[in-house]
């Protein structure tokens, strides 16, 4: 039986194999010897379109910054070799390396153009996102450059006389003898001024000065803790009251404590001076009527006389 080689029939097969080391060296040699086809920029087209991001329909489109051209990367391609069964690897046609060179160049060129278009679209999208970033907030510790040159004006309580002149409808009940208002606000007794000290924790007033100066606050504390009934809080606030219960025992206890605390003996005269100061302050600062038995006259708007005029005519 004759073999196929004896009859002279040659069978061609297509073998797909990765390029070997010798094949790569020979391919590089063929590339150096043969002239490469150079494509112009007009012939190069992007495979896919690039996305252009905009902030809105009213905002003009920002030009994308130009990026430096990246070096083209050559892809590893599998070489299709038409092999002959009875021929060796060296007897392949000479035109095939040129075709492989052209295919590799076209693939690398298209890949580079697609990469450049993708990078430009990503840069434009980043610019759009940066343009829509929220404004920076000021630092909490940063102080403003504004300098306060004028101090705020202190709110002063207006005198009742001025309020009577501005709005006479508030004080309509006038005393017939002294000509002063007889409403509850004007006839209420005026207390001595007081304030809060030590970060608004301690009350600074004339009453507290008398109690702390004569050690009466210590006596009140003892009566408060020693009382067993519910009425202990009442006479602990007024230890010198004669109308409360346990009056004799309270005075005996205060007399015994005065031997150790002689400042308790100064409490009665200090209390009398406090009442005198209250009376003087109330006499000078109370704007209302002090008459006990007097008739009340009702005034209407313009017919109401001012308190500065004295008695009614």
Swiss-Prot record:
Topological relation to the membrane, as annotated: Peripheral membrane protein
Keywords: Acetylation, Cytoplasm, Developmental protein, Membrane
Bias type Low complexity, positions: 106-125
GO CC field: cytosol; Golgi apparatus; membrane; nucleoplasm
Residues modified to N-acetylmethionine: 1
Superkingdom as given in the UniProt entry: Eukaryota
InterPro entries: Sprouty, Sprouty_domain
Purpose of the protein: Inhibits fibroblast growth factor (FGF)-induced retinal lens fiber differentiation, probably by inhibiting FGF-mediated phosphorylation of ERK1/2. Inhibits TGFB-induced epithelial-to-mesenchymal transition in lens epithelial cells.
The protein's name in its UniProt record: Protein sprouty homolog 1
